[in-house]
Amino acid sequence: MSSSLWLQCLQQLQEELPATEFSMWVRPLQAELNGNTLTLFAPNRFVLDWVRDKYLNSINRLLQEYCGNDIPHLHFEIGNKRVTAPKSETIAPARTRTAADVAAESSAPAQLQARKPVHNIWRDEEPVAVDLNHRSNVNPKHKFNNFVEGKSNQLGLAAARQVSDNPGTAYNPLFLYGGTGLGKTHLLHAVGNAIVDNKPNAKVVYMHSERFVQDMVKALQNNAIEEFKRYYRSVDALLIDDIQFFANKERSQEEFFHTFNALLEGNQQIILTSDRYPKEINGVEDRLKSRFGWGLTVAIEPPELETRVAILMKKAEDHQIHLADEVAFFIAKRLRSNVRELEGALNRVIANANFTGRPITIDFVREALRDLLALQEKLVTIDNIQKTVAEYYKIKVADLLSKRRSRSVARPRQLAMALAKELTNHSLPEIGDAFGGRDHTTVLHACRKIAQLREESHDIKEDYSNLIRTLSS
């Protein structure tokens, strides 16, 4: 059995899994073959449990395929593989180079490609004195235990947890992107709180990108730019929200570029959020956009129905209000764009119930949210979905209704059907009828196909999220 066994498995898994999943869960694994036992080393318990739960069957299948009857026994451990392994074959660390790796290496400064060990708080055994006057700005209310997990934010939450457990080493930088009100800021604060809980001496700073700009301007005005540099380069974790506001601010970008490099070289954690994918941020230098993608980039999508219901139930519980399941589903089916909108609607319902003393029923919600529901129903129609999808893909609405089966038409048609199922209250037969008299089974197939492609294709996932944002805004 050759030492390339695990590398063969890696190469196949990289083809089968979405790039984000592969980078987050599989690539960090190290492997060692000793006799008839293949040991996979995970960096922490969270990764180990996730891999065993999600990918064990795939790994065993590949081992069976490559080894036949000589399939090795699979064993998992936490930590790094042993430095020496006498009388055994040692498989290289699980680091499969991709095109993204090559691009990052070609643009990364030499000192960051071969990062030197740096004395920092994550490895200090003794307490370190920290300036207690530093501005943390981390909101203690936003923690992991009150963040509602769903399919739309599962990867982002998992990445944030890993970073909080292994700051400066797990994924650096971590870049979270998605529309307004989807929970990116909550995750930033949750990471900050978790880091401080684990390491009370850690100097964690959260801020909006505009605050960084304001601080730099004040430093220039007061001839205190060196103090500014020292402050930002001394933090153990820098959490910056809405990085897209750096657009067209050349001096701020220049200073952040050097701050970014200094923090990364010092193994200090950086987490950034934006409303769009790094390469789509206009007005930001290419060298910065390249660096944004050096660690891990994760999309936070609009919450699906089940997550929206869970969010409403959790918020109602926080207010010590009983919310019937059917009421939660009624609200969740009609308000789909983001978490903030859901919370605002629920707050209005609760306030009205407190003022009037009436029970929260579907009829009461329909009355309390009359204007909001009317606006949503007016905005999202099948006709509107068809026009928006056709415009997005630069085809005609008539193409969506036609019998054409070319990929350039069939895929947008399937997306439009899936969006109609997600964003309207029409039945499958009604949706099929609106798309050229198609059968309800065709609509069902389209919905399932798009759900599958959103897991496998970054482009389809992005298109779907963009269309949801456009139609819900």
From Swiss-Prot:
Location in or out of the cell: Cytoplasm
Record region (Domain III, AAA+ region): 137-353
Example of a GO MF term: lipid binding
SUPFAM superfamilies: P-loop containing nucleoside triphosphate hydrolases, TrpR-like
PROSITE patterns with a match to the protein in the record: DNAA
Entry keywords, A to Z: ATP-binding, Cytoplasm, DNA replication, DNA-binding, Lipid-binding, Nucleotide-binding
Highest taxon in the source lineage: Bacteria
GO CC annotation, single: cytoplasm
Domain II: annotated segments: 91-136
Stretches the record annotates as Domain I, interacts with DnaA modulators: 1-90
Residues engaged in binding ATP: 181, 183-185
Pfam families attached to this UniProt entry: Bac_DnaA, Bac_DnaA_C, DnaA_N, Hda_lid
Entry's Gene Ontology BP terms: DNA replication initiation; regulation of DNA replication
Classification via Gene3D superfamilies: 1.10.1750.10, 1.10.8.60, 3.30.300.180, P-loop containing nucleotide triphosphate hydrolases
SMART domains attached to this UniProt entry: AAA, Bac_DnaA_C
Residue span of region Domain IV, binds dsDNA: 354-473
Quaternary structure note: Oligomerizes as a right-handed, spiral filament on DNA at oriC.
Function per UniProt: Plays an essential role in the initiation and regulation of chromosomal replication. ATP-DnaA binds to the origin of replication (oriC) to initiate formation of the DNA replication initiation complex once per cell cycle. Binds the DnaA box (a 9 base pair repeat at the origin) and separates the double-stranded (ds)DNA. Forms a right-handed helical filament on oriC DNA; dsDNA binds to the exterior of the filament while single-stranded (ss)DNA is stabiized in the filament's interior.
PANTHER family for the chain: CHROMOSOMAL REPLICATION INITIATOR PROTEIN DNAA
Family per similarity comment: Belongs to the DnaA family.
Domain commentary: Domain I is involved in oligomerization and binding regulators, domain II is flexibile and of varying length in different bacteria, domain III forms the AAA+ region, while domain IV binds dsDNA.
Name assigned to this protein: Chromosomal replication initiator protein DnaA
Native organism: Vibrio atlanticus (strain LGP32) (Vibrio splendidus (strain Mel32))
Lineage: Bacteria, Pseudomonadati, Pseudomonadota, Gammaproteobacteria, Vibrionales
Gene coding for it: dnaA
